[in-house]
Amino acid sequence: MLKNSKYINLRIFIMHSLMKTITKGINMNDMKKIGLTALAGSLVAFSANAAEMTVSGATLLTYTSEDTTEVTGNPFGMKTNLAFTASGEVNGMTVSYYQASKDQFAGMSSARLSIDMGDMGTLAFDQGSGSGLATIDDKTPTAAEEIWDGLDTDGSSGANGLVGAAGNSGVFNYINTFGGVTFNGAARRGSGTKNSDGASSAAGGSAWDFALTTDGSMLGLDGLALGAGYGEKIVGTQADSTPGGDDEHMTAFANYSMGPVTFGYQVSNIDKGGAAAVDQEVSAWGLAFNVNENLSVSYGERDVTFKNPSATDVEESGEGIAIAYTMGSMKIAGNRNEVSNNDNSAGTNDEMTEIAVSFAF
């Protein structure tokens, strides 16, 4: 028993001597710093492990044929996109960031910072990914591109019958579902611009809008999808002094699927606030058919009536046919679009044919 006590005392003496040697010249403040540094490193490692990042992308090769005066050179083109998504948990909420980059990283094409608050919904700041009323600007079914895609002064500019008062850039976005109905609202202050950090945009009207979407389960109709939305661009303010009142955007759609066939119909109105502004009324329909799990075809028509306040109204009439074949990550798609009285110009016609091969990864 006494022999074991001697061994224990000897070990304590050796450990005490080693600690004195190691800590010689180090005060308690230094020891605290070492401890805090180690703790901070542990916390950083923990946060990094809690985050997830994914990368996706696509490459698109196209052949485009338009009017003889529009395509006079090489009709082939290519586009590549990369999208980065990062997400992690902060105080019980999921914070995620999305950014898509243009060809050769020439710049940011869209970005989105969002906070998923569970039952309280999702709050986001959007720089081009899609929010509010713009998410249902054209819901008619198609196998490839929309009826207006690729035509002169097409709806991608935000005019020509496509609703979306707040737009997609520089907007705050809130999404939540109540009783089977999804609310998607957007609001911006001033012009809708993709500002970088520390920057501000030029003058422009503030705007807000929302979209409501649901399915047919509330009505006992499987295969039915419904939606409607409304928005205003506020004019006559310091930011936008255009006289005549606010711009109003509204739309409603219904799509019904039965087996391999989907039919959709949509109406929209854009009432301009300016005294001499041109209002727009839109009606469109589309029919899509899935031949099998790989092949689909579609056809649709779209009319836009331009209500000219001091001239005869002009009705733009467009139609388009599309086909798409998917095999794994590869997709081959083609569409042919035509329009008469294009963009409120009587007698002006346009046409576009495109064949595209894309690879997703």
Residue positions per predicted region:
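Outer-membrane beta-barrel proteins
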Residues: 2-361
